Amino acid sequence: WQVVLDRYGLEKKSRIGYSIGAAYAPDWGEHTLSFRPNETVLVPENAVVHIILGMWMDGWGMELSETLHVTESGYTKMTDFPQHVHLVQP
């Protein structure tokens, strides 16, 4: 993620995903799995995670969001929403 942003002189300091589900009761600090630089927690099989690649800048923004079920061989998407770019003009 950051390697691509570096090409455009952008930086994302916040995480790009986190664990969700009944086993991860929410709180403001969460203190569970987060996808961020230097994260050391392994993602266990059967975990459910929300990946949110977003940038919100002055005058523009973008966001990609996907909920995934982690499997032994990779992941399964939890939604079937079409994956298209939706351009919204102000």
Language model features: what each stretch is:
Residues 86-90:
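A short, polar/proline- and glycine-enriched secondary-structure boundary/capping micro-motif
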Residues 1-82:
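Active-site cofactor/co-catalyst pockets and adjacent glycine-rich loops in catalytic enzymes
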